[in-house]
Curated annotation (Swiss-Prot):
Keywords: Aspartyl protease, ATP-binding, Cytoplasm, DNA integration, DNA recombination, DNA-binding, DNA-directed DNA polymerase, Endonuclease, Hydrolase, Magnesium, Metal-binding, Multifunctional enzyme, Nuclease, Nucleotide-binding, Nucleotidyltransferase, Nucleus, Protease, RNA-binding, RNA-directed DNA polymerase, Transferase, Transposable element, Transposition, Viral release from host cell, Virion maturation, Zinc, Zinc-finger. The active site is at D461. Transmembrane segments: none annotated. Mg(2+) 1 binds at D671, D736. Residues 1338-1476 form the Reverse transcriptase Ty1/copia-type domain. GO terms for molecular function: aspartic-type endopeptidase activity; ATP binding; DNA binding; DNA-directed DNA polymerase activity; RNA binding; RNA-directed DNA polymerase activity; RNA-DNA hybrid ribonuclease activity; zinc ion binding. Signal peptide: none annotated. Its main location: cytoplasm. Residues 363-372, 1038-1053 have a biased composition (Basic and acidic residues). It is found in: Cytoplasm; Nucleus. InterPro entries: Aspartic_peptidase_AS, DNA/RNA_pol_sf, Integrase_cat-core, Retrotran_Ty1/copia-like, RNaseH-like_sf, RNaseH_sf, RVT_2, TYA. This is Transposon Ty1-MR1 Gag-Pol polyprotein.
């Protein structure tokens, strides 16, 4: 480094040693405005660093360290005594007024002496303001006075820096605008440079060349104030001056930074694009340069990703480095670090090759001549710490233990180097220690110290003013190309590649950082004691340690050779992986692979694994010796630290100190468990536990929720309890970081009570082990107690409380005492404790009647907290009581599901006592449990509901046990108890295995069959399907409780005098077992047909022949015979072959008539006069009288493992109440939420399609100007009623496209925000079917259209606001709606009014009265369904004209123009239609069903024999009360909704033959018994098997140009609950079935005729409405017909005799029918029952009959 000699005018005071080696920042002439922006961030600290590190002496002044002090004391700044500045001066009032700055009010505010004006600066009129310099002052301004203690520069330097006194400095202009401040600063800096003050301005190194004096600072302040008036300063300048009005340097630094930041980005990008590297400069410097540019761009908001950065770097590689372009060209995941690693490897290899060549050229003797000393050409100067020792040192290197630096950098005081015992050093030159240079550049002399190098250590150098290091591995925050010139003792430049920080981690676990320079051209790594002293670290060579001023030892010092060293192990490595470049020659001729390179290449494996693999030759091409393992031990891979980061292990025993520090009940642990799902509202869902640290005493409290007030109540209770009961105050409560503990309410409560909350650390649950383990123990006890007792799940907290009582009384193995003993309480009296769930009899002290029993069976739970009684659960009353009036049942089973309490009491009065509590669940609770809570996209924190498939999988973990007992005979014991509540045993059936738990592909084909012998003797059994039928068995056994049904009476023979209603015999459910299902012949089957006895109101004419049509002539019209025949002529009625009369055998004639009044819900129309009634027999015809059932599904036990869990709360569901509670079929959600479609969607392809649809929807919303984008509203300013939540829904359309829709949450819309009177209309399905039928008959063209985003075309009138879509990131703002967003209550009505107005006014259409969304004119008919349009016209051009007009206003898409004469396929509102104009039309849903049914998770049977009918006749739905666990009940109801919802959609579209089965099962959605679910599965299986069936229409060929509209009616009398009949109607237009209806009668019918009248009366209004629609669409005459198979009904309709009206209800209906028949010209005709196709709408039919009635119109 450059030598600095002491001036002759500067005496050596204070015994300061001279500097032997220093570094000097050479002053440059570079304009400070041209420095890089990245190099100016420290410019702000220039003024704070001025003199901050320089010792203050009486001979040298310094700026106070706290320069931000508002009023520094003048006494702290000594004034010069004999210098050229004799007096202190402040700005006067006149000067202040001119500059605009306020006058200093106190001398202490301006303590610095005024900087007198230089004679070179003579502005006009300024002579009176500033005192001139004395004439004898001939040095420049930075030259201090001799008394200042500083040295004058030599004459040469003074001469070069002086400016002639004859020249005038041009003053800067006065600032006139804040916008011109930066330009003014440029001129002001030039002014300072011309005034010889340029060296105090920060340069490119971010530091000034020298420190300013007090006088210079005063001059700076005065000139700045004079030429920059305060009113024109920018705000940021005023902010700086408000803190310290003298900090002008900070203002100049920031100004320079701001000026350079404008052009720095362009320069960086240009530099990055024009990179060039060929190995001529060190790779470290190249990497530092590029890294610096990338970091700077990233900080300025211009991020450059790895791929682009690597392309820039590779483009600039040349020479030997060029091949890296090709080697890395195809690398996909390439990073800048990897690329620079390869560059470093190549550079190191080049340097190694050069050093090897140099070694061969030089002899070993020459190498020994390398020395750290050079020839002394100046007079040696002795610098000693001990003057008593002679100067006997020889010419050698300066030792690092007794020299210090003396330069502009701050140096240590003499006391920093303590007690050296070495001899004084004789330096032959001013600087005797060099920093090293490249050995190839020059030859140096060497002393006799040849072995003075210690690897892995830093050389301590007291003469070096800077720390230098050869490896960039330890440099932090490196920046390249520093403007620093460093020279050695021979004044040779040492190139510096980078500057950064060197970070130490010493023994006292402290970290320290100093500045470091990087250069590979030195022989040793030098550590400057001067820079260590600046951070309060000194070297004590008596102790050989580095220590702080307070004596703290930081690191040992090692003396090796003649030098002192410090180990590099205290250095912290940086994240720059750069190979160390050393210029010391190596004796190795081969290059080793660095371990970091091998570590990264071998997937970041550890060193031990890599070495073991190389030893065993599992990796070839190189050996273990080819790797440099020196850095493997202490190597830290940052990527491994990040990628393999793990949690620390919990420290065991960390809580032991608390046990000794706190008294009992002062330190508590608490935690919350929950929630427990599927519990009644009265049962708690959570519990909170407390544990005392010292005594381990536990408390538990129930919680229904985790709200703040609930938690606060518990804390208040527990604190009061401890304070009053134990006279203790809680000091600390340890808890986790749940929101229930970290909320502000609880925090304030604890703070108010002086309690310290102690929270667990993140991801360290074991730190909360006391509370966590307690909860786990209590839950284990809870599950065990519930399993042992068999009690329902809603009593779970009682089990928790029982366990807590016991656990507090058990001794701990460690303390040998129980928690109660530690707390000073007495032991638990076990005589007062009962086993949990112990059966007891509780005294009923308040019975309803004196004759009622006084004892109620119950179960003991736990001792009462509030009394001396016991808490007992009473199942019959469904409540718990606190009582002492109980008796323990000795020797009885303790399991709820094994103990028969009804058998114990033997008194039916108890059942009557508790009967009122067995009511069916309220309809509002059912509705609430079945609602699907769909949250908006903005409420992602809320719970996400399970997908139906996931829910089914979750619930499929439980299996109910199987009653595998063989059928038993009916004994007297089985008759004795008729109302016993039978519960399935809780034990796991041994027959259950994996094969019968998992869903089976086949169901058992053998149902439960009644006893054959008893059946043959006249006894009849009702089919009771067992709760579980193992799927591995071929036969199912009769349930053990089948004989206990209250409706069953066993008898050996049938009595003619029997008056009780008897159940209709049940046909078997099919099978192949010859022992249970004997084969029958057709002759025997025919004998089973029994004619029902005539009703009292049945006309005798019904016994007439059934093979001809009887025309009925009304009073108003007397059509001819051919009119009635023409009505029936074209109908798709079955063709019946003639049948000879069959006489019944004597045995059949002796059978009594079957009572038709059934109280059971049935799928068979047994009570109807037109039904086929069958009885059990040994032989039957499978084809005629029953439906084939090939699979016996166990509806909930096939996938349930619930029997392995504790018993749960159960619901008792009554059939009648469940049927009455069903109002409508709840639609099943078919759409996906945002999280389901995108966030958690694992199907990548589908996810991408949904994302594309999402962006498409957003663009459409913006295009349609759905909301006001000009203003966003604060949520707090808007009425919450007008704020509508929004969400995105996604679905996949039938054509395979994915669609997203932004919708409003209309389900939670406030009623005040819409008009409830507005209606959203869509086309009626009958209107669509009618239009299609007329189109076929008239050869119409059918065109299908779609209007995109239809609702958004309708304006919204109300003031509504929504939250913006999620992608806008504005969750706290609101936007006002301008258009009718999908989902709003009024959107549909708004769109309907908009499109209706347009079609009428612009397209010339008229809406058909009474039929909304049906528009017509003379040429075109339009059916509108929201945004879908179907156009019908004779001429295709008419459709095109309508389309052109629609496109003028709406975004109209043509789905199918329909211009082809061949078969055209449509998808209209879910119907798959095949249409060939003028020939036929086929309507089906095969593709849709193929896609949807498998998603229902119904176990289909694709390989077995297909079902031939959707149901089986004569099968009753059991009325017995259904008892289910609550979660099972909800799951089954939800499953029924899905299945019936799909079946209903299909049935009302075109499968009218299934409507009876769908309607009947829909009534039992809330009664999901095993039998009902089996029937539902059968229906879905039948739909699957017949999914290819279609509704077939052929073009009619009428004789006359008329339309014929016919309704066929039928009723099944009394086959529904409450004697309700089933009615059905089928509507036909020109012989084509266009609709059907099957429903339960709204009134109770007392006869078949009443049922038929009711059915006809329900069909006539729709018949008249359809007639009007047909006449409007097709201007032709119309003939209307009404067909029924009830002659008595026809006679009542056409008769004028009112005596037939037996009651007012049906009399009114009959009279209305008479009027309608006569007034509307209805032709009422009779049709044979066997040809009545409406028969399929009212009852289940045998296979043969079902096929016969449906195969002509659906196949």
């Amino acid at each position: 480094m450059e030598s600095q000699q002491l001036s002759q005018h500067s005496p050596i005071s204070h015994g300061s040693a001279c500097a032997s080696v220093t570094s000097k920042e050479v002053q440059t002439t570079q304009d400070p405005l041209d420095i890089s922006a990245s190099k100016t961030e420290e410019c702000e600290k220039v003024s704070t660093q001025a003199n901050s590190q320089q010792p203050t002496t009486p001979l040298s002044s310094a700026v106070p360290e706290n320069h931000h002090h508002a009023s520094p004391q003048a006494a702290q700044v000594p004034l010069p005594q004999n210098g050229p500045y004799p007096q202190q001066r402040m700005m006067n009032t006149q000067q202040a007024n001119i500059s605009g700055w306020p006058v200093y009010g106190h001398p202490s505010l301006m303590p610095y002496p005024p900087y007198q004006m230089s004679p070179m600066y003579a502005p006009p009129g300024a002579q009176s303001q500033f005192t001139q310099y004395p004439q004898y002052v001939g040095t420049h301004l930075n030259t201090p006075s001799p008394e200042s203690g500083n040295s004058f520069p030599d004459s040469s330097s003074a001469k070069s820096n002086m400016t002639s006194t004859n020249q005038h400095v041009r003053p800067p202009p006065i600032l006139t605008s804040p916008n011109d401040f930066l330009n003014w600063v440029k001129i002001y800096i030039k002014f300072l440079q011309n005034s010889n003050l340029g060296d105090i301005i920060p340069t490119a190194t971010r530091k000034a060349v020298r420190q300013m004096t007090d006088d210079e600072l005063t001059f700076l302040c005065h000139t700045f104030q004079l030429f920059a008036p305060s009113q024109f300063l920018p705000p940021w300048v005023k902010d700086i001056l408000s803190v310290d009005y003298t900090d002008i340097m900070k203002i100049l630094s920031k100004s320079i930074n701001k000026m350079q930041s404008d052009t720095q980005e362009v320069n960086d990008i240009t530099t990055l694009a024009t990179l060039h590297y060929n190995g001529s400069t060190p790779a470290d410097a190249f990497e530092a340069e590029v890294t610096n540019i990338l970091d700077r761009l990233n900080n300025n908001g211009i991020p450059i990703n790895n791929k682009v950065a690597c392309q820039f770097i590779m483009r600039g590689l040349s020479g030997e480095y060029k091949f890296l372009r090709y080697a890395r060209h195809r690398c996909i995941h390439m990073t800048v670090a990897d690329l620079f690693s390869d560059i470093h490897s190549m550079y190191e290899e080049q340097q190694e090759s050069k050093r090897n060549k140099s070694t061969h050229r030089r002899s070993p003797s020459d190498e020994k001549k390398d020395s750290r000393t050079y020839t002394n050409t100046t007079k040696p100067k002795s610098i000693t710490r001990n003057s008593q020792k002679p100067n006997n040192s020889q010419s050698r290197t300066a030792r690092a233990h007794n020299v210090s630096t003396f330069n502009n950098s701050p140096g240590p005081d003499n006391d920093l180097i303590r007690g050296s015992t070495t001899e004084p050093i004789q330096l032959k030159n001013t600087h005797d220690l060099h920093l090293g240079q490249e050995l190839t550049e020059s030859t140096v002399n060497h002393t006799n110290h040849s072995d003075d190098k210690l690897p892995g250590h830093l050389l301590l150098d007291s003469g070096a003013s800077r720390t230098l290091i050869r490896s960039a591995h330890h440099i932090h925050s490196a920046s390249s190309n520093p403007d620093i010139n460093v020279v050695d003792a021979q004044k040779r430049n040492i190139p510096i590649n980078a500057i950064g920080d060197l970070q130490f981690h010493f023994q006292d676990n402290t970290k320290t950082s100093i500045k470091v320079l990087h250069t590979p051209n030195i022989a040793y790594d030098l550590l400057s004691l001067n820079e260590l002293a600046a951070v309060d670290i000194t070297a004590c060579f008596t102790k050989n340690v580095l220590e702080r001023s307070d004596g703290t030892v930081l690191a040992p010092i090692v003396k090796y050779g003649d030098f002192y060293w410090v180990s590099k192990k205290y250095l912290l490595p940086s994240n720059i992986s750069v190979p160390t470049i050393n210029n010391v020659h190596t004796s190795e001729s081969t290059r080793k692979y660095p371990y970091p390179f091998i570590h990264r290449m071998l997937a970041h494996a550890n060193a031990q694994t890599i070495r073991y693999s190389l030893k065993n030759n599992t990796i070839t091409y190189f050996n273990e010796s080819d790797v440099d393992w020196s850095s493997a031990i202490d190597y830290q891979c940052p990527d491994c630290l990040i990628g393999k980061s793990t949690k620390h292990r919990h420290i065991k025993g960390s809580r032991l100190k608390y046990q000794n520090s706190y008294e009992p009940f002062q330190y508590l642990h608490t935690d919350i468990f929950g929630p427990v799902h599927n519990l009644p509202k009265s049962a708690p869902s959570y519990f909170i536990s407390f544990t005392d640290e010292t005594t381990k005493f536990r408390w538990v409290y129930p919680l229904h929720d985790r709200r703040e007030d609930s938690i606060l109540d518990v804390f208040t209770t527990i604190l009061a309890f401890i304070k009053n009961q134990f006279q203790a105050s809680v000091l600390v409560i340890q808890m986790d970081r749940g929101s229930e503990y970290t909320n502000r309410t609880l925090h304030k409560f604890l703070e108010k009570n002086g309690i310290t909350p102690c929270y667990t650390t993140t991801a360290d649950s074991r730190a909360h082990g006391v509370a966590e383990r307690l909860n786990r123990t209590l839950l284990d006890d809870c599950r065990t107690q519930l399993q042992c007792s068999g009690l329902p799940n809603h009593l779970w907290f009682s089990a928790i409380e029982f366990s807590t009582i016991v656990r507090n009384s058990l001794a701990s193995p460690k303390s040998k005492k129980s928690a109660r003993q530690h707390a000073g309480l007495a032991g638990l009296d076990i005589s007062t404790l009962l086993p949990f769930g112990q059966p007891v009899i509780v005294n009923d002290h308040n019975p309803n009647s004196k004759i009622h029993p006084r004892g109620i069976p119950g179960y003991a739970l736990h001792p009462s907290r509030n009394s001396y009684g016991y808490i007992i659960y009473l199942p019959s009353l469904k409540k718990t009581v606190d009582t002492t009036n109980y008796v323990i049942l000795q020797g009885k089973e303790s399991r709820l599901d094994q103990f028969n309490y009804d058998a114990l009491t033997f008194d039916e009065d108890l059942n009557r006592l508790t009967a009122s509590y067995h009511s069916f669940i309220a309809s509002n609770e059912i509705q609430q449990s079945n609602d699907l809570n769909i949250e908006s996209d903005h409420d992602f924190q809320s719970d996400i509901e399970l997908h139906p498939e996931q829910l089914r999988n979750v619930l499929s973990k439980a299996v109910s046990p199987t009653d595998s007992t063989p059928p038993s005979t009916h004994t007297e014991d089985s008759k004795r108890v008729s109302k016993t509540n039978i519960r399935a045993p809780r034990e796991v059936d041994p027959n259950i295995s994996e094969s019968n738990i998992l869903p089976s592909k086949k169901r058992s084909s053998t149902p439960q069959i009644s006893d054959i012998e008893s059946t043959g003797s006249g006894g009849m059994h009702r089919l009771d399907v067992p709760l579980l039928a193992p799927m591995s068995q071929s036969n199912t056994h009769e349930s053990s409780h089948a004989s206990k049904s209250k409706d069953f009476r066993h008898s050996d023979s049938y009595s003619d005098n029997e008056t009780n209603h008897t159940n209709v015999p049940i046909s078997s459910t099919g099978g192949t077992n010859n022992k249970t299902v004997p084969q029958t012949s057709e002759q025997e089957t025919e004998k089973r047909i029994i004619h029902r006895s005539p009703s009292i109101d049945t006309s005798s004419s019904e016994s007439n022949s059934l093979h001809h049509v009887v025309p009925i002539k009304t009073s108003d019209t007397c059509p001819k015979e051919n009119t009635e025949e023409s009505i029936i002529a074209d109908l798709p009625l079955p063709d019946l072959p003639p049948e000879p009369p069959t006489e019944l055998s004597d045995s059949f004639k002796e059978l009594p008539p079957i009572n038709s009044r059934q109280t059971n819900s049935s799928l068979g129309g047994i009570g109807d006069s037109n039904a086929y009634t069958t009885i059990n027999s040994k032989k039957r015809s499978l084809e005629d009288n029953e439906t084939e059932i090939k699979v016996s599904r166990d509806t909930w036990n096939t996938k349930n493992m619930r029997s392995l869990e504790p018993p749960r709360s159960k619901k008792r569901i009554h059939l009648i109440a469940a049927v009455k509670a069903v109002k409508s079929i709840k639609p099943i959600r078919t759409t996906l939420r945002y999280d389901e479609a995108i966030t958690y969607n694992k199907d990548i392809k589908e996810k991408e399609k949904y994302i594309e649809a999402y962006h498409k929807e957003v663009n459409q919303l913006l295009k349609m100007k759905t909301w006001d984008t000009d203003k966003y509203y604060d949520r707090k300013e808007i009425d919450p009623k007008r704020v509508i939540n929004s969400m995105f829904i996604f679905n996949r359309k039938r054509d395979g496209t994915h669609k997203a829709r932004f919708v409003a949450r209309g389900d939670i819309q406030h009623p005040d925000t819409y008009d409830s009177g507005m209606q959203s209309n869509t086309v009626h399905h009958y209107a669509l079917m009618t239009s299609l039928s007329l189109a076929l008959d008239n050869n119409y063209y059918i065109t299908q259209l779609d209007i995109s985003s239809a609702y958004l075309y309708a304006d919204i009138k109300e003031e509504l606001y929504i939250r913006p879509p999620p992608h806008l990131g504005m969750n706290d703002k609101l936007i006002r709606l301008k258009k009718s967003l999908y989902g709003l209550k009024q959107s549909g009505a708004n769109w309907y009014e908009t499109i209706k107005s347009y079609l009428i006014k612009q397209c010339g259409m008229e809406e058909v009265r009474g039929w909304s969304c049906v528009f017509e004119n003379s040429q075109v008919t339009i059916c509108l369904f929201v945004d879908d349009m179907v156009l019908f016209s004779k001429n295709l051009n008419s459709n095109k004209r309508i389309i052109d007009k629609l496109k003028m206003q709406y975004d109209t898409k043509i789905i199918n123009l329909g211009e082809s004469d061949e078969e055209i396929q449509y998808d209209i509102l879910g119907l798959e239609i095949k249409y060939q104009r003028g020939k036929y039309m086929k309507l089906g849903m095969e593709n849709s069903l193929t896609e949807k049914i498998p998603k229902l998770n119904v176990p289909l049977n694709p390989k077995g024999r297909k079902l031939s009918a959707p149901g089986q006749p004569g099968l009753y739905i059991d009325q017995q009360e259904l008892e289910l666990e609550e979660d099972d009940y909800k799951m089954k109801v939800h499953e029924m909704q899905k299945l019936i919802g799909l079946a209903s959609y299909v049935g009302y579209k075109f499968r009218f033959d299934l409507l009876y089965y769908i309607n009947t099962l829909a009534q039992h959605i809330l009664f999901p018994s095993k039998q009902v679910l089996d029937m539902t599965y059968e229906l879905i299986q039948f739909i699957w098997n017949t999914r290819d069936k279609q509704l077939i229409w052929h073009k009619s060929k009428p004789v006359k140009p008329t339309n014929k509209l016919v309704v066929i009616s039928d009723a099944s009398y009394g086959n529904q609950p409450y004697y309700k009949s089933q009615i059905g109607n089928i509507y036909l237009l020109n012989g084509k079935v266009i609709g059907g209806k099957s429903t339960k009668a709204s009134l109770t019918c007392t006869s078949t005729t009443e049922a038929e009248i009711h059915a006809i009366s329900e069909s006539v209004p729709l018949l008249n409405n359809l007639s009007y629609l047909i006449q409007e669409l097709d201007k032709k005459p119309i003939t209307k017909g009404l067909l029924t198979d009830s002659k008595s009904t026809i006679s009542i309709i056409i008769s004028n005799n009112e005596e037939k009206f037996r009651n007012r209800f049906f009399g009114t209906k009959a009279m209305r029918l008479r009027d309608e028949v006569s007034g509307n010209h209805l032709h009422v005709c009779y049709i044979e029952t066997k040809k009545n196709i409406a028969d399929v709408m009212t009852k289940p039919l045998p296979i043969k009959t079902f096929k016969l009635l449906t195969n002509k119109w659906i196949h």
